[in-house]
Amino acid sequence: MKETAQEYKVSAVIPTLLKNWILRVVYATLDHIPPFVWEILHVITDIYFFWVQKLINYVRPHSRVIYYNAIKKLDECDTYQMWCQQASVVDEITGANLWRRNFFSRRYDFNSVIEQYSILENMLREEKYDVVKEKFSTTGPCMLRNFAGIGDKKLFTKSLMGTKLLIEQYLTRILEGLDILNNQTLTPTSFFQRCKLSLGTTALILQGGSLFGLFHLGVIRGLLLQDLMPNIISGSSMGACVASLFGCLSNEQLKQLLTDDNLLNIIKNDVDLLKSCGYGNLEQHLNLGTLIQNLIHHGYSQDVYLFIRFVMKYIVKEKTFEEVYQITGKVFNIVIHPTDKSCPNLLNYVTTPNVLIKSAIECSLGSGVISEDTSLLCKNLENEIEPFLNINKNKQVKFLTPENANNPSITESPYTRLTELFNVNNFIVSLARPYLAPLVVNDLKHEIKTSKYYYYKHYPNMPPINANTVRKTQRSSSQSPIKAGTVEDLEPEPLMSPVPPSSAVNDSAEYIIPELGIPQLNFTEMEPLAFKFKYHLERKLKNIATMEFRHRMEVLDNLGLLCSLIKRLIIDEKTPRSATEIAVVPRMKSLSLTRIIEGQLNNIPYWIKSGERSTWPALALIKTRCAVEFKLDDIIRARRSR
């Protein structure tokens, strides 16, 4: 029996030794490959993709080449204003600009929107501000984030420029009404506070990012520059580090830090910080084998580790959650995964006001990632640093990484706790994983990019209506609850001069829609049946493949068959995942293996720009859902400062 046990131990040790020996050989081989070999491989790869693209353009029809060239220029835009100009060109090519001008859609109740718009317009014109206050607070639906379905994602996937112009003008009227009420001295601050309580709050969730965590910086910059950044933010792992950066600095300081290469220059000037993170001489060539070994065994690329050290040294220092909240007024949360359930899993200025932010970041990253001795620290009444948990429990508590943590129930989820504490009912999720971008079901993907089947050039044949019919229709519509004169004022002006596609010029005459009593371009969302079936079949198959892939990975993880690297790439914490959430995901074009492995310093501005560009297509949806909320925040903040 003893010999059998010894043979079993030997047979179990041999594969492990063989595996370690093979890995050492691979790492040593990669370390000794000259740098010019990698440069030659990069040149060969660039040449290959260049000629492949040339061949594809040669085979495509000329009209398709024009379309793809317009889409390609979107990726070359450096500012949001440039992106909007190019997006308007794409909308003209696809006919989406005409779709925006048409009120009709099955996705929202446009009749209810027109009715509320008409009532609000009349009350503001007649200066009946008491009635407007009632519409905002008690009798009206203006303080609903998704009133009549105007927040449906499908309304934001047709046009790159945004949604229906009717929805945009409706929200503009609400904002104008709030400004007018704010200027009225008889309107108390409590009125705006009740409106805000009814509407709810938005939170930004920064999920993970051990490899692409710097992407979160670009998402924050993109939202800040458009004044769409929520005041509540939550993060785990690398997202906790970025959330701490946001919470400790004012918005103006953040804009300055994330502009140009300011962040990179601060890091470059600290030679001690660079050396402690393994950079040494900036001109020194980094050994590829050593970098891959760090990436696999420690789970963080070198540039991400450098940023974590920078935040701890320059930003959070020895500050606590309450101290930071008193300075900036921002609510930032850090999610941790302790093995002891008596320890809170959501840390902020309410639940753990005296906890050191630095220790919270280390616990969110996980025990043994940054330091072996990971524990929560806090300040006592004498301003001395001591363990947050008692000594006996502190020795036993371990903090798990997000991929190794057991998924809590809905009642124990930190995001449920976030909703309870701060009335959060709208989430923006930043998912720093480019390789999962095609598999994210609730990501905002524009159909003109993911599919070429939706073109708004096919209109039903309707006979033109002469002027007598127009006057007759307008007289009949004047007897309806919605006055014809009011609705005529509602006809939206296009943001750009619409250029109908050539195939629709002869069919795009103006007709009268009896329900509205105003001229409208004669087209709907009805596409040719074959195109529509093909698109929906493709979308359904993709959703099925996504759910099947996620299910299989979770089963393998529960059985313990996934290695640590695969778990780090695929398995993560359960963040809010529903049809109402907005997910911002890096594009697959942003995925660069050489940048991940080498971890060069220029990765920081690269990922900031990549994250900022990824937010641009989602800004229209974010503005629709959050514009009224942010206006109320501004009004309340201004009144309190008086």
Swiss-Prot record:
Motif (GXSXG): 235-239
One GO CC term on file: lipid droplet
Highest taxon above the source species: Eukaryota
Hydrolase in keyword set: yes
Catalytic residues of the enzyme: 237 (nucleophile), 403 (proton acceptor)
Polar residues bias (residue ranges): 471-481
Record's subcellular location: Lipid droplet
Catalytic activity as recorded in UniProt: a triacylglycerol + H2O = a diacylglycerol + a fatty acid + H(+); 1,2,3-tri-(9Z-octadecenoyl)-glycerol + H2O = di-(9Z)-octadecenoylglycerol + (9Z)-octadecenoate + H(+); di-(9Z)-octadecenoylglycerol + H2O = (9Z-octadecenoyl)-glycerol + (9Z)-octadecenoate + H(+); a 1-acyl-sn-glycero-3-phosphoethanolamine + (9Z)-octadecenoyl-CoA = 1-acyl-2-(9Z)-octadecenoyl-sn-glycero-3-phosphoethanolamine + CoA
Xref: InterPro entries: Acyl_Trfase/lysoPLipase, NTE, PNPLA_dom, Triacylglycerol_lipase_N
Chief site of localization: other
Free-text function comment from the UniProt entry: Lipid particle-localized triacylglycerol (TAG) lipase. The lipid droplet/particle is a lipid storage compartment which serves as a depot of energy and building blocks for membrane lipid biosynthesis. Involved in the mobilization of the non-polar storage lipids triacylglycerols (TAGs) from lipid particles by hydrolysis of TAGs, releasing and supplying specific fatty acids to the appropriate metabolic pathways. Also catalyzes the acylation of lysophosphatidic acid (LPA). Important for efficient sporulation, but rather through its acyltransferase than lipase activity.
UniProt protein name: Triacylglycerol lipase 3
Source organism of the structure: Saccharomyces cerevisiae (strain ATCC 204508 / S288c)
Gene: TGL3
